[in-house]
């Protein structure tokens, strides 16, 4: 027997033998083979019968019935032999293949053989159809074209466009594509390139998420609506699926054959097909194994001759990396730049998509949610592009509401938990026989009955609200279908149906939706929330970015107005610095500062221990509600030239290149942060060169060429240069100095240490004055409050007398070293005593401790269980 079968036929024969053996049949008949052909619903045999308008599924069932009634044998393990009917069927199919000048016998040869002289059940099934042999052969020739079965995989490459492409025009006709809002200029430019005589292949280039694929979908929708030039009318726009094209290509040459099949089908269409290739850079190297040609080289001749109309889409980085290197491929495409839409355009895009997301999730998306999604994503999610990031926010917020709609409302959940607890308590009380227990049982019964009644009312309300929401979802779904039907009727010029839909059915349904929405909104104390609003959008943004939700909405203005008060709770005696920093943050948040510069750039100058680093920490907490928002870089680590590259990452070829820079990576992950350069005077001069572009343009390029946005960060540098001069001046003037007087002292030192271009880029140089004696008591209170907080975790309350407070402030004061000696003094005099007493068991839980001054020593008194 000639073994030249296509892969599909070989697989069918194997499946027929395997099924016969499984059923313990003595031989493999032609019906086993027919069963194997029909079992593969994606196969060529099945699709041929389907394309003729017959019912191949019914034939499959009849064939399966037939083979299950064949005689079996009891002995296992014996391989069945091919029957005479199967052998003659194979020979007949091979003769047909030979007469058609095909090298390989394929499924269609077997189908013709069955059609000519197949036995039951095929023969009886064929009689019920009205299909002639001539019609079958015509259908085969239509699918095949001028192709012959000249390789084992030839059958797989028939109808290649249907297998490896997605028809965007069909999807647009069925209303399955999202509406494309705006982008008229880009779609017009794409059509302009497609209408050219040569190089009529547009290449859509833009950042990820700006809507390149949407432009192709918009073009498909315009083709369906006939809103295009005459030369593009009735064209088919197909999207190539590279994944399915490559998948399963085990042997060399299979991939090329599939691609050749696609190109032949496109050539056969005589210019009626436009191919859209998303992520077009994947063509470079695709399918190239052991010296085989890649997809790009196979496409070049078709692109050059104008056989293939192609729209490519890729990002600028990938275009430069892959396509620009291949000059022959590059010149066959014409670039169409797709820029990120503006805030206004993004809002319009989201308005257009709102109804689709409302219908899908069964929720209501407010106008404020759309504005919040665009504005908050634009401001806080800096590493992604509009409109993609704003659409994702709306989608995730709507899915959260939908998830909540499907679960029990909190009031019902709380009541059910309370009821379960009371029932357990009642059962326990029933075991007691005392009069008090009986009285308690009666009380519990009354409370249980009351909660059951409340639960009944709540469940009824929940059911009603669920029904209204489900009804709204169904009505909105129906409205979308009616609108789609209206468009289809208008295209077919069925104006009677258009009038009925436009002036009767659609307005009536819209009125029903409005009434249901009003009924839902007017319900008092609603259990279910089906509205996506700005607060929910802000909540999702906070989950993505880690920036607290309440820091983004109305409360922010109130908080910024009182920023000084909050900062002074942690930083004492530095009114000048606190005020200047607060003003800079208010300027930035109100939108009046330069949008292309960081939020603020400050140099804090002053002696050690006066609150420079503490103010940076306090700012991080106030602005972002967490101390983790402080990116702290100790400049003593960047004193040598070779360490400077750690800020932006090692250059290519050096160890650490893949890891990125310590500053750039931290800012990429957390663009909203306070960046603290501690002891900046110790940094190598090259560090200042890097910081110049950051302070001036709010951007920093890392070693990989990625631009990091620094516009939302607050940069603080600390230094103690000139602090000895400042201390001398303060000792001479006990009343304190104004900022101008302090700067007169520090100016010469600053100019000596820092270059003019660096000083010129600072928003302000803020002097921190040495702490005065009267500041120390406030710092003692802050330190003791922190200690009290730690003791409260052990259920111990701490108090102190004014005398103890004054003594700690006096003894811990050192103008040269700031607040740090005070912290050490409290540790020695107070914390050491308390820790020893706790370990000895002298301070049990629920104690109250009072710090008192005895002579010149701090002592504590412990009052267990109550205050003194």
Swiss-Prot record:
The UniProt annotation places ATP 2 binding at 606-613
The record's section on Pfam families has: AAA, AAA_2, AAA_lid_9, Clp_N, ClpB_D2-small
The record's keywords, sorted A to Z, are: ATP-binding, Chaperone, Coiled coil, Cytoplasm, Nucleotide-binding, Repeat, Stress response
Q: Where is this region: Repeat 1?
A: 5-70
InterPro entries associated with the record: AAA+_ATPase (IPR003593), ATPase_AAA_core (IPR003959), Clp_ATPase_C (IPR019489), Clp_N_dom_sf (IPR036628), Clp_R_dom (IPR004176), ClpA/B (IPR001270), ClpA/B_CS1 (IPR018368), ClpA/B_CS2 (IPR028299)
- Can you quote a single GO CC term? cytoplasm
- Cite the residue spans of the region called Repeat 2: 82-146
Residue stretches making up the Clp R domain? 1-146
The record, for PROSITE patterns, names: CLP_R (PS51903), CLPAB_1 (PS00870), CLPAB_2 (PS00871)
| Residue span of region NBD1 | 159-340
The positions annotated for binding ATP 1 are 206-213
Q: Where is this region: Linker?
A: 341-546
A GO molecular-function descriptor: ATP binding
Segment NBD2: which positions? 556-770
Query: Which parts of the chain are coiled coil?
Result: 391-525
* Domain note: The Clp repeat (R) domain probably functions as a substrate-discriminating domain, recruiting aggregated proteins to the ClpB hexamer and/or stabilizing bound proteins. The NBD2 domain is responsible for oligomerization, whereas the NBD1 domain stabilizes the hexamer probably in an ATP-dependent manner. The movement of the coiled-coil domain is essential for ClpB ability to rescue proteins from an aggregated state, probably by pulling apart large aggregated proteins, which are bound between the coiled-coils motifs of adjacent ClpB subunits in the functional hexamer.
> Which named protein is this?
Chaperone protein ClpB
Source organism (scientific name): Protochlamydia amoebophila (strain UWE25)
């Amino acid at each position: 027997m000639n073994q030249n079968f296509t892969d599909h036929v070989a697989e069918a024969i194997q499946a027929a033998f395997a099924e016969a053996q499984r059923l313990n049949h003595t031989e493999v008949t032609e019906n086993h083979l027919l069963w194997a052909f029909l079992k593969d619903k994606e196969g060529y045999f099945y699709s041929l019968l389907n394309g003729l308008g017959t019912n191949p599924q019914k034939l499959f069932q009849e064939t399966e019935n037939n083979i299950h009634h064949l005689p079996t044998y009891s002995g296992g393990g014996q391989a069945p032999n091919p029957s005479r009917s199967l052998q003659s069927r194979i020979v007949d199919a091979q003769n047909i293949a030979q007469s058609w000048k095909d090298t390989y016998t394929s499924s269609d040869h077997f189908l013709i053989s069955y059609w000519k002289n197949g036995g039951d059940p095929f023969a009886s099934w064929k009689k019920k159809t009205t299909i002639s042999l001539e019609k079958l052969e015509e259908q085969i020739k239509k699918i095949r074209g001028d192709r012959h079965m000249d390789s084992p995989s030839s059958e797989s490459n028939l109808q290649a466009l249907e297998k490896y492409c997605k028809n965007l025009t069909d999807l647009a006709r069925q209303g399955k594509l999202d509406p494309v809002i705006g982008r008229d200029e880009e779609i017009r430019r794409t059509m302009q390139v497609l209408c050219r005589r040569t190089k009529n292949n547009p290449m859509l280039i833009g950042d990820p998420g700006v809507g390149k694929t949407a432009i192709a979908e918009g073009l498909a929708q315009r083709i369906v609506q006939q809103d295009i030039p005459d030369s593009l009318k009735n064209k088919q726009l197909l999207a190539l699926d590279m994944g399915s094209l490559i998948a399963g290509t085990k042997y060399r040459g299979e991939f090329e054959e599939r691609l050749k099949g696609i190109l032949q089908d496109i050539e056969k269409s005589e210019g009626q097909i436009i191919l859209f290739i998303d992520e077009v850079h994947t063509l470079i190297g695709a399918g190239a194994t052991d010296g085989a040609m890649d997809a790009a080289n196979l496409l070049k001749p078709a692109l050059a001759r104008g056989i293939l109309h192609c729209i490519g889409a890729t990002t600028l980085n990938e275009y430069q990396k892959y396509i620009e290197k291949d000059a022959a491929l590059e010149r066959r495409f014409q670039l169409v730049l797709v820029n990120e839409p503006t805030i206004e355009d993004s809002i319009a895009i989201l308005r257009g998509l709102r109804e689709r997301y409302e219908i899908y999730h069964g929720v209501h998306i407010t106008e404020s949610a759309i504005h919040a999604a665009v504005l908050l994503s634009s401001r806080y999610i800096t590493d992604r592009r509009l409109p993609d990031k704003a659409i994702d926010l709306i989608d995730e917020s709507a899915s959260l509401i939908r998830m909540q709609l499907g679960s029990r409302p909190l009031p019902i959940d709380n009541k059910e938990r309370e009821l379960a607890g009371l029932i357990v308590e009642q059962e326990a009380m029933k075991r007691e026989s005392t009069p008090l227990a009986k009285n308690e049982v009666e009380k519990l019964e009354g409370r249980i009955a009351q909660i059951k009644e409340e639960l009944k009312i709540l469940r009824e309300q929940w059911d009603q609200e669920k029904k209204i929401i489900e009804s709204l979802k169904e009505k909105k779904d129906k409205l979308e279908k009616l609108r789609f039907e209206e468009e289809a009727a208008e295209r077919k010029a069925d104006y009677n149906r258009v009038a009925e839909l436009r002036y009767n059915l659609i307005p009536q349904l819209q009125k029903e939706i409005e009434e249901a929405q009003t009924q839902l909104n007017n319900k008092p104390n609603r259990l279910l929330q089906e509205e996506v609003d700005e607060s929910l959008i802000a909540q999702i943004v906070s989950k993505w970015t880690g920036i607290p939700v309440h820091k983004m909405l109305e409360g922010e203005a109130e908080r910024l107005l009182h920023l000084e008060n909050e900062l002074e709770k942690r930083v004492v005696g530095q009114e000048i610095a606190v005020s200047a920093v607060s003003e800079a943050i208010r300027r930035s948040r109100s939108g009046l500062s330069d949008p292309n510069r960081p939020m603020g750039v400050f140099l804090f100058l002053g002696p050690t221990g006066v609150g420079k680093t503490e103010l940076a920490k306090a700012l991080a907490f106030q602005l972002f509600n967490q101390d983790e928002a402080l990116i702290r870089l100790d400049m003593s680590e960047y004193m040598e030239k070779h360490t400077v590259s750690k800020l932006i990452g090692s250059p290519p070829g050096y160890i650490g290149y893949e890891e990125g820079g310590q500053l750039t990576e931290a800012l990429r992950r957390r663009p909203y942060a306070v960046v603290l350069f501690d002891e900046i005077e110790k940094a190598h001069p090259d560090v200042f060169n890097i910081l110049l572009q950051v302070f001036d343009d709010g951007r920093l390029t890392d070693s990989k060429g990625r631009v990091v946005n620094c516009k939302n960060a607050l940069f603080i540098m600390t230094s103690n240069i000139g602090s000895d001069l400042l201390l001398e001046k303060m000792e001479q003037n006990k009343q304190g100095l104004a900022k101008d007087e302090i700067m007169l002292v520090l100016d010469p030192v600053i100019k000596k240490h820092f270059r003019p271009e660096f000083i010129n880029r600072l928003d302000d140089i803020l002097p921190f004055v040495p702490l005065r004696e009267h500041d120390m008591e406030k710092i003692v209170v802050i330190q003791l409050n922190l200690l009290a907080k730690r003791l409260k975790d052990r259920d111990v309350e701490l108090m102190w007398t004014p005398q103890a407070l004054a003594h700690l402030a006096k003894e811990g004061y050192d103008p040269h070293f700031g607040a740090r000696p005070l912290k050490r003094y409290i540790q020695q005099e107070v914390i050491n005593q308390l820790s020893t007493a706790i370990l000895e068991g002298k301070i049990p839980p629920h104690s109250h401790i009072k710090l008192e001054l005895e002579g010149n020593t701090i002592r504590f008194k412990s009052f267990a269980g109550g205050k003194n």
